[in-house]
């Protein structure tokens, strides 16, 4: 194995950047060339079919089978112009990845010959095996039927020679088995709730759209080094490895010069993104060595989420071409920053108003404050649901590690905006407001744009920060599907806005004027949500103590955090807003707990194998060298001198023996703990057992191995070390 390590280093030293050439010097010449967007639809579809598609996208109007046939035929004609041979229904099962089954256009004609055909029926629906994907017990193996159904709001696209049709994935009995179905429901729920609130201010607003701008962080590692680390290959992270003498402490990687091989990879990634209509805009070095980021311009949430799933697939495929492997695990290396996926979330009206941006007048600012304050209340009431949406076996290693937001949910507004909310509380009383009081309050509200111009600072330790015209949810992990957090946030926001509107309307029914009713409920909401507002250092111990005093939860136990998917508040949101039914919600919990269990189980097995079959033999081989050295010393030197000269080696032999014995004992104990957990029939008990009885062994075993790495001869150490993984370019 040590030979493989040095062979990998030798191979890496001979790598050269690949030459990458864009199809044209003008981006607009090829942007969206592989997407069946509206421009292509106009070209390839009859007028009635084009109108039917646009009505379906904008108004939700159903598409008839006859029209579907016309659309399918036009889509096939366009795809054939790109040399496409197959089509697939592209969907997002509960695996945190995507799935696809490729079918050819080939069919037998009436004369027995072969023809190419793609019908509306094939476009609209297919039947993959639902029992082979995570389903939380909804589908048994003998109940395999599931359906994929075309999501007309997300355009079809071409990858290589395959036409990909974005779809939802449901069971034969109608339960959602994917991320897209509940995401679309959550977006519809917040659209309706937000529109109803907007109409208190402006009757011209008839729709509210959710926008998402994600920031994808990732690590790159040379494929030779990757293949020489079985833990990276099988788990996505290093289960062992002593910290490099130099890592990120000099802060010289962030925004630094991008290495040539990485630049070539990034260029090709951007070209492929742009062909697929993904508006990739920003690329840069991140904080940790060999860590990078890609960020696009924000888009409609559903499309943005599809694009993020596409980007993660593209990264893996293109990286291999450049002799890299992409690491999307949240914490592939201990001791340096992990990777997140910031979700920049905003709500915009069909009249062009960003509801999280201050208006141009007091009325516009009242609308802004209404949505700002309700967002705060949403986070406060649903902190456990938001945490559950981002909690996983991998993300837990990142949260609160002085690099990412803590597991405590809080909101950062900036001191000036917080003061504005406090001023509203001070000025709004319980009695009827005088015209003068209303004028004073509205004048104060009118100053908000000036306040935000210079004083909306950025607090990198805040999990849910207001950044001037959006909220940035920073707790989501780099490998996650954005839909998980977007479902939680949008469903919870819909629930909160519905409550707000009902409270305002109740006061209006009692004879209170509309403006005053809004101010009174805003005041109540500001006071109630005050514990969630925090401007300080989210990494500090003082904040943990203060958060506890405020009643904010801090759950770092993964299964315990996930169990909050089915607490009363989460049910009132997810079931109450009709995002899930009871069966679907329970199945989601089961899937997440089973995923957690399996990931820890795999890590335990891989670490046990590497420890016993790679590390222990290497340590014993080195120990034997030392013993041979001692025998040689004893033959040459007198007894008294021998004792002095051999003391350090004897101590090292003793240390290695202690470490080897400890590793063997701990691996044996971990294996027994896994066996006990595996025999538990209840998936909840099994997950808790893996969290409490199995996972702690991973760090204990690692500690002994990392010490051995610093004691054993570098020439025989079998696995690439951190300095090689992180600093070889």
Language-model features: where?
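C-terminal amphipathic alpha-helical interaction region
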Residues: 525-729
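Glycine-rich, acidic/polar active-site loops that bind/position phosphate-bearing ligands
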Residues: 143-328, 337-340, 347-590
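Short linear, low-complexity motifs centered on an aromatic residue
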Residues: 96-112, 131, 229, 236-238, ...
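Histidine/acidic residue-rich metal-binding segments in metalloenzymes
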Residues: 14-120, 124-140
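Active-site proximal loops enriched in glycine and acidic residues that flank catalytic Cys/His/Asp
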Residues: 67, 91, 119, 296-298, ...
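N-terminal hydrophobic targeting/anchoring segments and the immediately downstream early-domain regions
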Residues: 2-24, 132, 141-154, 162
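Composition- and surface-driven signal marking solvent-exposed, interaction-prone regions
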Residues: 232, 308, 330-331, 357-361, ...
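Active-site-proximal loop/turn and secondary-structure-junction residues that shape catalytic pockets
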Residues: 67-71, 91-93, 121-122, 169, ...
């Amino acid at each position: 194995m040590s030979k493989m390590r040095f062979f990998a280093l030798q191979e890496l030293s001979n790598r050269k950047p690949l030459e990458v050439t864009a199809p044209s010097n003008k981006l607009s010449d090829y942007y969206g060339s592989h997407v069946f967007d509206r421009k292509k639809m106009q070209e390839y579809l009859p007028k009635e079919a084009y109108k039917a598609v646009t009505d379906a996208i904008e108004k939700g109007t159903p598409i008839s089978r006859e029209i579907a046939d016309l659309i399918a035929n036009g889509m096939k004609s366009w795809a054939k112009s790109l040399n496409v041979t197959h089509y697939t229904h592209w969907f997002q099962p509960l695996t945190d990845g995507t799935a696809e089954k490729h079918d050819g256009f080939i069919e037998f004609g009436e004369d027995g010959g072969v023809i190419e055909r793609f019908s509306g029926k094939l476009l609209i629906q297919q039947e993959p095996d639902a029992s082979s994907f995570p389903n939380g017990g909804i589908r048994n193996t003998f109940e395999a039927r599931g359906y994929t159904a075309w999501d007309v709001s997300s355009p079809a696209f071409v990858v290589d020679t395959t036409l990909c049709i974005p779809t939802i994935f449901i069971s034969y009995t109608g339960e959602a088995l994917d991320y897209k179905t509940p995401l679309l429901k959550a977006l519809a729920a917040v659209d309706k709730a937000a529109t109803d609130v907007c109409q208190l201010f402006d009757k011209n607003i008839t729709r509210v759209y959710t926008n998402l701008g994600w920031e994808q962080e990732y690590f790159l590692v040379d494929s030779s080094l990757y293949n020489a680390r079985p833990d990276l290959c099988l788990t996505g992270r290093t289960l062992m490895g002593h910290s490099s003498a130099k890592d990120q402490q000099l802060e010289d990687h962030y925004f630094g010069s991008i290495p040539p091989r990485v630049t070539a990879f990034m260029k090709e990634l951007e070209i492929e993104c742009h062909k697929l209509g993904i508006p990739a805009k920003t690329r840069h070095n991140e904080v940790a060595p060999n860590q990078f980021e890609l960020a696009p311009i924000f888009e409609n949430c559903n499309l943005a989420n599809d694009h993020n799933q596409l980007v993660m697939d593209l990264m893996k495929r293109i990286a291999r071409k450049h002799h890299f492997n992409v690491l999307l695990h949240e914490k592939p290396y201990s001791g340096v920053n992990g990777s997140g996926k910031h979700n920049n979330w905003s709500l915009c009206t069909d009249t062009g108003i960003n509801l999280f941006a201050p208006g141009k007048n007091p009325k516009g600012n009242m609308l802004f404050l209404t949505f700002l304050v309700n967002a705060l209340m949403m986070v406060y009431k649903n902190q456990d649901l938001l945490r559950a949406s981002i909690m996983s076996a991998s993300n837990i290693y990142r949260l609160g590690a002085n690099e990412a937001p803590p597991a405590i949910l809080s909101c950062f507004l900036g001191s000036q905006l917080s003061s504005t909310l406090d001023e509203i509380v001070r000025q709004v009383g319980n009695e009827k407001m005088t015209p003068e009081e209303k004028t004073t309050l509205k004048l104060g509200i009118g100053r908000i744009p000036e306040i935000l111009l210079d004083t909306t600072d950025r607090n990198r330790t805040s999990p849910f920060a207001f950044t001037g015209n959006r909220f940035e949810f920073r707790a989501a992990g780099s490998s996650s599907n954005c839909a998980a957090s977007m479902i939680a946030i949008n469903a919870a926001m819909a629930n909160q806005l519905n409550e707000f509107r009902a409270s305002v309307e109740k006061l209006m029914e009692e004879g209170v004027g509309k403006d005053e009713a809004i101010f009174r409920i805003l005041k109540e909401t500001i006071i109630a949500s005050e514990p969630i507002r925090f401007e300080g250092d989210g990494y500090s111990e003082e904040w943990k103590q203060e958060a506890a005093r405020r009643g904010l939860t801090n759950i770092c136990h993964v299964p315990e955090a996930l169990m909050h998917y089915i607490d009363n508040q989460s049910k009132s949101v997810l079931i109450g807003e009709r995002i899930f039914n009871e069966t679907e919600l329970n199945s989601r919990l089961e899937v997440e707990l089973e995923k957690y269990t399996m990931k820890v189980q795999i890590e335990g097995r891989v670490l046990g194998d590497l420890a016993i079959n790679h590390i222990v033999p290497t340590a014993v081989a080195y120990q034997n060298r030392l013993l041979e050295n001692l025998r040689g010393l004893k033959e040459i030197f007198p007894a008294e001198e021998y004792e002095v000269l051999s003391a350090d080696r004897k101590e090292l032999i003793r240390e290695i023996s202690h470490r080897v014995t400890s590793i063997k004992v701990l691996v044996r104990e971990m294996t027994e703990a896994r066996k006990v957990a595996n025999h538990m029939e209840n998936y909840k008990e099994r997950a808790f057992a893996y969290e409490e009885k199995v996972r702690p062994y991973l760090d204990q075993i690692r500690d002994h191995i990392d010490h051995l790495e610093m004691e054993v001869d570098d020439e025989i150490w079998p696995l690439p070390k951190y300095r090689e993984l992180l600093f070889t370019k």
